[in-house]
Curated annotation (Swiss-Prot):
Gene Ontology, cellular component aspect: cytosol
Any one GO molecular-function label of the UniProt entry: RNA binding
UniProt cross-references to PANTHER family, sorted A to Z: ANTITERMINATION NUSB DOMAIN-CONTAINING PROTEIN, N UTILIZATION SUBSTANCE PROTEIN B-RELATED
InterPro entries according to UniProt: NusB-like_sf, NusB_fam, NusB_RsmB_TIM44
Name listed for the protein in its UniProt record: Transcription antitermination protein NusB
Function: Involved in transcription antitermination. Required for transcription of ribosomal RNA (rRNA) genes. Binds specifically to the boxA antiterminator sequence of the ribosomal RNA (rrn) operons.
Sequence similarity: Belongs to the NusB family.
HAMAP family: NusB (MF_00073)
Biological processes annotated in GO: DNA-templated transcription termination; transcription antitermination
Keyword Transcription regulation: yes
Gene: nusB
């Protein structure tokens, strides 16, 4: 399984959280991981486990970034798909030093092109660029 496919599985798990009081549904997680089990290698399985766990544990902080840079949009007005993609990418940007920020942003844009509307990729790119710029100023 490529890292891109692992990100897709992770995004699906984060998406499920939006419908389960912002917690991972163990049964749903097992289903998603079972679908990709043939292709999972250890590193990608670890990535999925870690990114979903860190996203879940730091949801409030991640959502604060989304709220801050979602001009004229409340977080509850965002589509669950877009919200999940943003949460996953911001989690990567904040907590995965081994993943370049540009890679996280580009992969989020690709997820949006695949799973969301035509305009979502630009919107997601804009929010993530602002998050990255703020974090670069803080470092």
């Amino acid at each position: 399984m490529s890292r891109r496919t692992a990100r897709e599985a992770s995004m699906k798990l984060v998406f499920q959280m939006a419908f389960n009081d912002d917690h991972v549904d163990e049964v749903g997680a097992e289903d998603i991981l079972a679908q990709a089990k043939e292709e999972l290698n250890y590193n990608n399985y670890q990535y999925i486990e870690t990114v979903v766990s860190r996203t879940e544990s730091n949801l409030q902080k991640i959502d604060e970034y989304i709220e801050k840079f979602s001009e004229n949009w409340k977080i509850d007005r965002l589509s669950k798909v877009d919200l999940s993609i943003l949460r996953l990418a911001i989690s990567e940007i904040l907590f995965f030093d081994d993943i370049p920020t540009r890679v996280s942003i580009n992969e989020a844009v690709e997820l949006a092109k695949k799973f969301s509307t035509d305009k979502a990729s630009g919107y997601i790119n804009g929010i993530l660029d602002q998050v990255a710029n703020q974090l670069n100023k803080a470092r």
